[in-house]
Regions:
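Non-heme di-metal
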Residues: 2-389
Length: 389
């Protein structure tokens, strides 16, 4: 089965927002006026290799206890695990069973022991790849000469997270979009980001029942803002849906999945991996903290690029909201969430830093892919998405 060379999506109303200069489209107005929009299950994508082909074939069948899934193995190497299309799509499908579900798929697959066994093998391979790319750092400061334990794990984590946030990585997607991107490249950027932002905050919320006390309170403070303080139209996922509509892109959940490469799926798969395993709660907290501490400046640049290309003020609210909210979240995440967790459980210091560094690595490889394609004059997507005229 092959993927079409392009998909046509509804265009903005021409008198309000031609595809080359997105504005407040009719679709955008409908989204803003329908805050309770309900996501359906994700559509099944085309396979990207033998593993995802076998998995999709399996998922189309009724879930039964007697099924043998030992053939669902990925034959790649750790060096390729983080960016391999076949593995990343397979992980995404397995994880999506825990979110919106998959269209036409028996929901009992979510907890099928054979599928969980197969997914655990894929996760081990992804973790092996991450260990190659992001070596573990248990302590960044002084250690006990006898045990090797950090003498100041909280200080180590605060210093490590701060240094990571202050590093202005290159290549920078936000700088490129602010200064150089074409409308089509900006549209591609939004397509990549739709894999996370249409379920923004959901993956990190897995940490809530795994934390307690003030640390849980810090996380809920952040997540409450992500979910719009209880106002559906203000949910960040809903603001992003409005942004997609203004650029003539589909707002249907996961409809653009076939277009994005494995390197894009890595970002969401990482959060699901950390979120669905209690033992990785430290990494999940570190990942979220890295997100919050490195969000305000890039979103300000995205907003400038959006406006430079004629984007509407209403749609720009998604970026503007992140500039303001994440400036506050940064301090809560660093001092109350991450440092608070390590203060309560010092042995998780290394995991917190690992999760943060994995977030930075995923951003880096995605940026290298996108900017590499754009500077070469080709699409960063597997197949381009075009807005209808």
């Amino acid at each position: 089965m092959t993927v079409d060379t392009a998909v046509t999506v509804p265009a903005p109303v021409p008198e309000l927002a031609p595809a080359s200069a997105p504005g407040a489209s009719a679709a955008e107005v409908r989204v803003a006026g329908t805050p309770a929009l309900h996501d359906g299950p994700a559509p099944l994508p085309a396979p990207r290799g033998p593993l995802s082909a076998a998995l999709l074939s399996t998922l189309r069948r009724e879930s039964t206890r007697s099924v043998d899934l030992r053939h669902l193995l990925w034959e790649g190497t750790p060096a390729d695990a983080c960016t391999d299309d076949d593995l990343q799509l397979s992980l995404w499908l397995a994880y999506e069973l825990h979110y919106r579900g998959l269209a036409g798929v028996d929901e009992r697959w979510e907890w099928h022991p054979e599928l969980l066994w197969a997914r655990a093998r894929w996760e081990d391979q992804l973790l092996a790849g991450l260990e190659l790319a992001v070596p573990r750092v248990v302590a960044t400061g002084a250690t006990d000469p006898t045990t090797g334990a950090a003498l100041d794990p909280v200080g180590d984590v605060v210093a490590g997270l701060t240094a990571l946030a202050e590093a202005d990585g290159e290549p920078s997607v936000s700088k490129f979009l602010m200064r150089n991107a074409t409308a089509e490249q900006f549209r591609e950027f939004l397509t990549h980001r739709s894999m996370y932002h249409l379920k923004e905050a959901d993956p990190h919320s897995w940490a809530i029942p795994r934390l307690s006390g003030a640390v849980k309170g810090a996380l809920i403070t952040i997540q409450a803002d992500e979910y719009g303080g209880g106002v559906p139209a203000a949910m960040h996922a809903q603001l992003f849906r409005r942004l997609l509509a203004s650029w003539g892109l589909s707002t249907t959940y996961a409809e653009l999945l076939d277009r994005v490469p494995g390197v894009t799926l890595l970002s969401t798969n990482l959060i699901s991996l950390f979120g669905l395993h209690r033992r990785w709660r430290g990494a999940l907290v570190g990942h979220l903290t890295a997100f919050e501490m490195s969000s305000s400046v890039p979103n300000a640049r995205y907003a400038r690029g959006h406006r430079r290309l004629g984007g509407s003020e209403a749609a720009a609210r998604f970026f503007d909201e992140h500039v303001v909210a994440d400036a506050v979240h940064e301090q809560i995440a660093l001092h109350d969430l991450a440092a608070g967790l390590v203060r309560a459980e010092p042995t998780l210091a290394g995991d917190v830093l690992f999760g943060a560094r994995c977030a930075a690595y995923a951003d880096q490889v995605a940026a290298e892919h996108q900017i590499g394609a754009w500077t070469a004059g080709v699409s960063s997507l597997r197949t381009p998405v075009v807005a209808a005229a």
